[in-house]
């Protein structure tokens, strides 16, 4: 897990991916790494 995902921020998914070095996705309030 990388960081919390806040759905109110439009760039959150992008930040999640960047935090996971290109492989991350928001699942509910969590940013999980290892997903494209």
UniProtKB/Swiss-Prot annotation:
It is found in: Secreted. The keyword Cytoplasm does not apply. InterPro entries: Scorpion_toxin-like_sf, Scorpion_toxinS_Cl_inh. Expressed by the venom gland. Disulfide bonds join 2-19, 5-26, 16-31, 20-33. Its main location: secreted. It holds the Pfam family Toxin_5. It comes from the Eukaryota. One of its GO terms (cellular component) is extracellular region. GO terms for molecular function: chloride channel regulator activity; toxin activity. Keywords: Chloride channel impairing toxin, Disulfide bond, Ion channel impairing toxin, Knottin, Secreted, Toxin, Voltage-gated chloride channel impairing toxin. Belongs to the short scorpion toxin superfamily. Chloride channel inhibitor family. The presence of a 'disulfide through disulfide knot' structurally defines this protein as a knottin. Toxin with unknown function in healthy organisms. On glioma cells, interacts with chloride channels (probably ClC-3/CLCN3) and MMP2 at the surface of glioma cells. This complex is then internalized via caveolae, thus inhibiting the chloride channels necessary for cell shrinkage and tumor propagation. Has been shown to weakly inhibit TRPV1 channels. This is Insectotoxin-I1. It comes from Mesobuthus eupeus (Lesser Asian scorpion).
């Amino acid at each position: 897990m990388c960081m919390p995902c806040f759905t109110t921020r439009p760039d959150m998914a992008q930040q999640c991916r960047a935090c996971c070095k290109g492989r991350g996705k928001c699942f509910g309030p969590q940013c999980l790494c290892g997903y494209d």
